[in-house]
Amino acid sequence: MRSGRFIGVMSGTSLDGIDVVLATITENMVAQQASLTWPIPHAIKEEILAICQGQSLTLSQLGRLDTRLGRLFADAVLALMRQESLKPTDVIAIGCHGQTVWHEPQGEAPHTLQIGDNNQIAAHTGITVVGDFRRRDMALGGQGAPLVPAFHHALLAHPVERRMVLNIGGIANVSLLAPGQPVRGYDTGPGNMLLDAWIWRQKGKPYDKDAQWASEGKVLLPLLQDMLSDPWFALPAPKSTGREYFNYGWLEQHMARYPGLRGEDVQATLAELTAVTISEQVLLSGGCERLLVCGGGARNPLLMARLAALLPGTEVSTTDEAGISGDDMEALAFAWLAWRTLAGLPGNLPSVTGASEASVLGAIFPANPPQNRS
């Protein structure tokens, strides 16, 4: 079982940047050493958003975007390597999630698509890449998501305390870590995605810093109840979703019944939607003693306050307080999953995804030996 330095690369549904993290990984340890966030150019972000909202495109357009994203991921890795004065031979492998542009786990032919050509990353960095993590789980009847609960369990499970780890990215998901019980985890619905989409359309800002705009508004109960009536929220766990479902078009459909709404009131209502749907799922799962929050939503004081209010008796804190960077959690998880793949160890948890069995995940894109690279 190889131990050493791994790099994790994550570009999530929030599209707020490419997270790259360097960690030393052994059988008993994941030690983060460095990280950075690499910007996603506006034009590429707009193309990704268009695909996720169902706009048509040619195979040529998709292929070009796949290549450009692969090169962008490689640039992000190379920036971290320069920052840390690393050579390709200093890193065992890169675990790259890719950019999800479609995720459809239901139906007669469930499928998911992450783009960002891993061949480009391997060729331009000179480091072996492990990618395409989700489709093996789907081939075994699973949802293909979430995959990070296995990592949460490895690092944050407690021998006696009933914990949940909540990641509030574009989509929010929870991992239940209860002593003596199988790990469970699933998506709860929108995290930051609709909040970010609304403020981007209304104010041209990528996100609502410190929930300043939402805090100026009031929750619109009719709109909130209308959104909560969406049948997805009533689906049993395990379940997963993404931008292809909860997008700006979804928000517009619900808002169309309520003309003349103030922008800040909509923002406040979207924050409440995120908090309510998370808290309901936490309670349906039996609750927890400690809720550890990571992702961009952990820096949203309104969301954190509402979660604490909706979950009395639960200590709501961040994973940073438990020693794991909330901003880098998912990138770290995919570095760890790459380590497991190369070690021949399963990366999914059937109790989380619904797969018929645990399996080694991903495909390996080997780097050329140093003597073969110019």
UniProtKB/Swiss-Prot annotation:
Gene3D superfamilies, alphabetized: 3.30.420.40
Pathway this chain belongs to: Amino-sugar metabolism; 1,6-anhydro-N-acetylmuramate degradation; Cell wall biogenesis; peptidoglycan recycling
Residues given in the record as ATP binding sites: G12, T13, S14, L15, D16, G17, I18, D19
Family matches, as CDD domains: ASKHA_NBD_ANMK (cd24050)
Catalytic class of the enzyme: transferase
UniProt EC number: 2.7.1.170
Listed Pfam families: AnmK (PF03702)
GO BP of this protein: 1,6-anhydro-N-acetyl-beta-muramic acid catabolic process; amino sugar metabolic process; peptidoglycan turnover
A single MF term (Gene Ontology): phosphotransferase activity, alcohol group as acceptor
Record's catalysed reaction(s): 1,6-anhydro-N-acetyl-beta-muramate + ATP + H2O = N-acetyl-D-muramate 6-phosphate + ADP + H(+)
Keyword terms: ATP-binding, Carbohydrate metabolism, Kinase, Nucleotide-binding, Transferase
Function: Catalyzes the specific phosphorylation of 1,6-anhydro-N-acetylmuramic acid (anhMurNAc) with the simultaneous cleavage of the 1,6-anhydro ring, generating MurNAc-6-P. Is required for the utilization of anhMurNAc either imported from the medium or derived from its own cell wall murein, and thus plays a role in cell wall recycling.
Family statement drawn from the similarity comment of this UniProt entry: Belongs to the anhydro-N-acetylmuramic acid kinase family.
Classification via NCBIfam families: PRK09585.1-1 (NF007138), PRK09585.1-3 (NF007139), PRK09585.3-2 (NF007148)
Protein name: Anhydro-N-acetylmuramic acid kinase
